[in-house]
Amino acid sequence: LDFAGSADGLILAVAPGVVTWSGPLRGYGNLIEIDHGNGWVTRYGHNASNFVSPGDYVKPGQTIALMGATGRATGTHLHFEVLYQGRHMNPARFVPGRA
């Protein structure tokens, strides 16, 4: 799910968890991946700058990155993914007003 935004807009963690990836990854550009436990993972892509590192614990609402257009992106936005047990879920189900 892509969220349009302004350059350097704040990206916040949606739930508590441990950062498992923070850095460039293929078309995602600068990516952050957070393991929330019980098989749940979120990904935040195309970031201008990442503020967290693998192994960091994050809290819900914590600023983890700045929005950008790195990787295969046509403009500034956040690419948001939700995975459960390694399978992509529809992230709109988890975003209020988007279901």
Where is each model-derived feature located?
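Catalytic cores of peptidoglycan-degrading enzymes
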Residues: L1-A99
